[in-house]
């Protein structure tokens, strides 16, 4: 079987490539000319440069190939301007799908890696309820809006295209850079949290996302959408407490600030990012993400229909991630 993975040099994409190789697939990694191949060193990997900003170029680049499976994991999570999210996440998906259709490529399955973020701050009344597939998305970030627009485009094609959408919650694990910043701060004995209202959060380890991807490729139902988490719900301090435990620090100062403090910090982070041309991790989208109180989601459909069973509870996943950060000189 021949598989194409977009975003192959990214956090999730690189793990998908590794699993495809493990399963003996002819594995093609779509990367940009400027992308790092640090985690794509296996000599069995075939590389292809795809220009997701041009449907015409995509057709030319894909024309010599017939892929059985395509996993679209490419996407922008931080951009200097909101419209850039749409160019990458929405238009990039649209152009890729159109190129596949115009070429008449007989793919068996197209898996789109979306996000729980497309739903925004819904079901925020306590006690919090799980976000379900029948809920109406109300994305509150440019990232979430762009991913939702990509989903809508896939839905508009209908049954003529064999797609499945995965909506993971916060994905963490070795190589991940955003949660790593929290670990860096805690190593310096500081844990910064915002908001005093209860916050229910969910996580999913990267290998569990990979598990779901290949289950979807194997026997998912066309047009279905699945939430992914480890099946548990945590309070906002759980992640930092586990990091602190694994780091073995003798003490940690937890600073909890009002939401308005975060608003000021992210405002200036966004401003400085645009001035310097390098987007800060603390930006306007991050403000809405950190402000959101309910990240519960219903993974029962993924378990029932895909056979998805998360193998990495938070304690195990954090232990593995921190060990990797230490072993690789990140911490």
For the regions a protein language model found, what residue spans apply to each?
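NAD(P)H-binding glycine-rich loop region in Rossmannoid oxidoreductase-like domains
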Residues: 46-91, 120-121
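Conserved C-terminal active-site "lid" loop/helix of NAD(P)H-dependent oxidoreductases
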Residues: 206, 241, 265-309
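N-terminal Rossmann NAD(P)H-binding glycine-rich loop of SDR-like oxidoreductase domains
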Residues: 3-23
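Active-site Tyr-X1-5-Lys
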Residues: 138-164
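Substrate-positioning beta->alpha
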Residues: 149-150, 176-181, 194-217, 223-224
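Mid/C-terminal beta-alpha module of Rossmann-like enzyme folds, strongest
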Residues: 216-282, 315, 319-322
């Amino acid at each position: 079987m021949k598989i194409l993975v977009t975003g192959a040099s990214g956090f999730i994409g690189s793990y998908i490539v590794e699993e495809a190789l493990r399963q003996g697939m002819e594995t093609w990694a779509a990367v940009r000319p400027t992308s790092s191949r640090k985690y794509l060193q296996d000599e069995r990997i075939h590389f292809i440069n795809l220009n997701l900003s041009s449907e015409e170029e995509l057709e030319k680049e894909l024309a010599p190939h017939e892929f059985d499976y395509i996993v679209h994991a490419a996407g922008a999570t931080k951009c200097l301007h909101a419209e850039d999210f749409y160019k990458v996440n929405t238009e990039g998906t649209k152009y890729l799908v159109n190129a596949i259709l115009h070429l008449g490529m007989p793919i068996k399955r197209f898996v789109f890696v979306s996000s729980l973020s497309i739903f925004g701050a819904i079901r925020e009344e306590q006690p919090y309820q799980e976000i379900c597939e029948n809920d109406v998305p109300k994305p509150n970030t440019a990232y979430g809006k762009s991913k939702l627009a990509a989903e809508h485009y896939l839905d508009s094609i209908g049954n003529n295209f064999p797609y499945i959408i995965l909506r993971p919650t916060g994905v963490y694990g070795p190589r991940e850079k955003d949660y790593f910043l929290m670990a860096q701060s805690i190593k310096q004995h500081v844990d910064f949290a915002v908001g005093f209202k209860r916050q229910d959060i969910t996580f999913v380890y990267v290998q569990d996302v990979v598990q779901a991807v290949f289950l979807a490729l194997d026997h998912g139902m066309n047009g279905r959408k699945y939430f992914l988490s480890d099946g548990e719900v945590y309070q906002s301090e759980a992640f930092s407490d586990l990091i602190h435990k694994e780091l073995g620090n003798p003490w940690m100062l937890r600073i909890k600030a009002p939401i308005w403090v975060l608003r000021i910090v992210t405002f200036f982070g966004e401003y400085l990012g645009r001035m310097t041309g390098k987007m800060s991790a603390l930006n306007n989208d991050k403000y809405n993400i950190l402000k959101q109180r309910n990240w519960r989601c219903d993974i029962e459909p993924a378990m029932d229909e895909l056979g998805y069973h998360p193998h990495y509870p938070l304690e195990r996943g954090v232990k593995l991630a921190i060990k990797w950060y230490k072993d690789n000189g990140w911490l």
